Design a protein with these regions (language model features):
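N-terminal ligand-binding/catalytic initiation module
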Residues: 1-83
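Glycine-rich phosphate/diphosphate-binding loop of Rossmann-like nucleotide-binding domains
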Residues: 3-29, 95-187
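General beta-strand structural signal in soluble alpha/beta enzymes
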Residues: 35-36, 61-64, 85-88, 119, ...
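Active-site nucleophile and cofactor-binding loops and adjacent substrate-binding regions
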Residues: 39, 86-95, 118-122, 238-240
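Short beta-alpha connecting loops at secondary-structure transitions
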Residues: 82-84, 115, 161-172, 231-236, ...
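Adenosine-phosphate binding glycine-rich loop
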Residues: 88-89, 108, 211-275
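Rossmann-like adenosine-cofactor binding region
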Residues: 164-232, 237-241
Length: 275
C-alpha cells in the first residue's frame, strides 16, 4: 500500500483512512460502503481477491495502491468486472485538480493549450492528473514531469510505461529549479518543502501553484504568497485556503455511476464531472 503521505504502513494501519473514506461516501452521496483492507502485495493475488468478492457490490473504489502496480490492477479489474471500478488516488485527484486548474487559468487569463506545466511527482496521482490535463487541451510538449531522479527524459533507461508517456526529448533541463523557470503551472504530488520561494519567483506572471503533497505541501501557502502577490495557490490541506480534495469528487462520480447503472467509469464521465 501507499497510504497518503505515510507510505507502506500495512493494510491494518491503513484501516482508519478507509473507514473515513467510507463515512464520506455516506455523508456526501448516501452510498453504503464496506471498507476491506487486503493484506496482499502480489498484484495477481490482489486482483483475484477483489474479483472473488465483487458479486456483493455495486462498485469498487480502489485506494492507496502504489504505482506502477495500481495501473495493472485497475485496468485488469475494469476489463474483467461488469461494475464500476475506480482507483481514487488517480482519478479523484485528477478530476478535482483539473477543475481547479481550469478555474485558475480563467482567473490568470491563460489558455490551457498555451501554458507550460511542471509536474513534480510521477506516481499514480501525478500521471493521472497530467493525462486528464492533456485530455482537456494541454500539450504534451509543454509538460515536464519529474521523479526522484529529476526531469524524466526519453533517453533514460528502464522507464515505466506511465513515465515513458510524459518523457521529454529536451536535454537542457534536469532539476526542478531548471524546469520551473518561466513555467505557468506547478503541480506537486511528491514530498514536502521541495519548492522554494525563489523557484516560485522564477515562474511566469500569475503562476498557478498546486502543492498537493500530504501532509506537508511542496511549499506552504504562506511562503508561496510571500514570494509573490500574483500567485494562484492551492494545497491539499483544509487549514489553508483553496483546498484541492478528492472528497468533492469520488462520492458523486460513484453516485452517478450507480444511479445510471453504468458498468464502468470512463474519461467522458471524469471530464463531465470536473465541470
Amino acid at each position: 500500500p501507499a497510504v497518503l503521505g505515510l507510505g507502506d504502513i500495512g493494510a491494518l494501519s491503513g484501516k482508519p483512512v478507509m473507514e473515513g473514506k467510507g463515512l464520506l461516501f455516506k455523508i456526501y452521496a448516501g452510498i453504503d460502503v464496506f471498507d476491506i483492507e487486503v493484506n496482499e502485495k502480489d498484484p495477481e493475488k490482489f486482483i483475484q481477491a477483489v474479483k472473488a468478492i465483487a458479486p456483493t457490490f455495486g462498485g469498487i473504489n480502489l485506494e492507496d495502491i502504489k504505482a506502477p502496480e495500481c495501473f495493472e490492477i485497475e485496468n485488469r479489474l475494469k476489463e474483467e468486472l461488469d461494475i464500476p471500478v475506480m482507483h481514487d488516488d488517480q482519478h479523484g485527484t485528477a478530476i478535482i485538480s483539473s477543475a481547479g486548474l481550469l478555474n485558475a487559468l480563467e482567473v490568470a487569463g491563460k489558455k490551457i493549450e498555451n501554458v507550460r506545466i511542471v509536474v513534480n511527482g510521477a506516481g499514480a496521482s501525478a500521471t493521472s492528473c497530467t493525462k486528464l490535463y492533456v485530455a482537456l487541451g494541454a500539450r504534451k510538449e509543454n509538460i515536464l514531469m519529474l521523479d526522484s531522479k529529476g526531469v524524466i527524459t526519453s533517453d533514460r533507461p528502464n522507464l515505466t510505461e506511465s513515465k515513458k508517456f510524459f518523457a521529454t526529448d529536451r536535454r537542457d533541463v534536469h532539476t526542478l529549479e531548471e524546469a520551473i523557470k518561466g513555467a505557468d503551472v506547478f503541480l506537486g504530488l511528491s514530498k514536502g518543502n521541495v519548492l522554494t520561494q525563489d523557484m516560485v519567483r522564477s515562474m511566469a506572471d500569475h503562476p498557478i501553484v498546486f502543492a498537493l503533497a500530504n501532509p506537508t505541501p511542496e511549499i506552504s501557502y504562506e511562503d508561496a504568497m510571500a514570494a509573490r502577490p500574483d500567485v494562484l495557490m492551492a494545497t491539499g490541506r483544509s487549514d489553508f485556503p483553496n483546498q484541492i480534495n478528492n472528497v468533492i469528487g469520488f462520492p458523486y462520480i460513484f453516485r452517478g455511476a450507480l444511479d445510471t447503472q453504468a458498468k464502468a467509469i470512463n474519461e467522458e464521465m471524469k471530464i463531465a464531472q470536473k465541470v
